[in-house]
Amino acid sequence: SCYTLDALTEVLEWNNQGTPADELACLWLAYLRWYRGMGFTPAAHAPFSLDREIDTSAPLTAREGPGQATLRALESGEMQTVAQNINPDALVTGALVRSCAFGFLPVAPERTVVLLAARAAALTHGHPEALASAAAYALLTRDVLAGACGSEQGKKNSIADSVRRVIDWCGSIPAEEAFPADAAHTREALVKALALQETEPTPEAVAEHFGTDWLCYTVLGIAVWNTLYCSARISASGEGLQAGLMRAVSADSDSDSIGAITGTLLGAHVGTLGDTQPLLEKLRGAADVRAVADRYIAQLGQRP
């Protein structure tokens, strides 16, 4: 996610200097630098780009179980697309978890977010449902953040309202090149999460209702369930947030990804309310992540 956001920052840097930039090219180069930063050797024919500030961060370039589909795509040295992809059946979570950053884009057209998230997902994952789940996550992040930062009425909207809107989107995807198939599995997972929002997502309940696979739409559904359950129980002081995050990473599935998605959505919803700041400071690499965010905000014309 941090490398995705840094790529979008680079696009803004070029634009602010009066030079148009190719978003997808910046994203691909960022992922190749991340691949290189983890100690892998890119293909000889892969394009090279100079290091950026993010590449000096040890926590953000630590090799912590990167997915095989992601590594295979980046190892090829060829830019993958929706139409031609080295991983046509890839349904795991590598593309999903890095897509939240597209929800931070301050653009009015929803279609811009959807297409960019889908095409960025296709850089490593080719299955249509992987593209759809990535776009759904980006849209959900965007909607939750808009509610938290908008009018007082908007702030009263629950995460459940945002989930319902994304479910509607999943059921109305137009037939176009970005999505060679519908988002039926992603929609089903979100519908199930919404129906279960009053049920505690214990590891046993998660296994019963979602199973233990590591598929992108399953992981998104579990994370949204955790988010819905936790968000309704966080006090004004932030009490309950840590318990919700601990619950998220206890699932017998891709718990890292479930925790990351849950944390992103809860963070977008509640911000740094109450006593959450000490919790944030405990995170490894927190300063590095904040620096990435500050550079993005600075390019938007705001002071960090």
Residue ranges: model-predicted function:
Residues 1-304:
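Structured, active/binding-site neighborhoods that engage oxygen-rich ligands
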